[in-house]
Amino acid sequence: EPSAWVGILVMLATGIYMIVQSFRLQLTNADDTRFVVNAVDTVRTNRMLLTDVNTGKEILSWTGDLFKDVISPWAVFAAYLSKITGISAASMMHTFLPPVLLAVMMCIFWLIAGELFDKHIYRSLFVILLLVMYMYGYFSIYNAETFTIIRLWQGKATMAAVGIPALLYAFLRLYRLLPDDRRWKEKTVYNAEQKGAIC
């Protein structure tokens, strides 16, 4: 149907606009430096997270922010991608990961919409609404929308933009695969009543 295709085209245009804006609004600060330095150092030394990003000296014990990096080695994953593709780690994180991760996020939104709506036009409108909310959600530097647009290559932003929606989709999908909810409840209550569990 034509309205579905119009919706899909508007959705794609909105997604492309968001990708362009993510390049324009990129934020590189001390937090970003830590992730990029960890990735570059991992590629350079072939060792994971053993250099203090502030001093350049070897880390003898992990404390504070350094310990946080060890338990969430997203920078090591970026270093791995850098190593197997031959692209520098900084370019991988600032140029290649954002559009790919934004496209993955939009695909997950489309899958969620597929679980919620039958018609393509409603799916498209749902994704457009979410993308617009992400674009206009830039009211604080600490919220998921801002992280998604200005620093998606960082692990916490990827978790908020891709990980949590993917988990939501998995739960929706699993819920759909369950047997009919009403029959399941009736059987459970019936069996419990027979055993005297419910008074």
Where do the protein language model's features map onto the residues?
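Start-transfer (signal-anchor) and selected internal transmembrane alpha helices
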Residues: E1-Q21
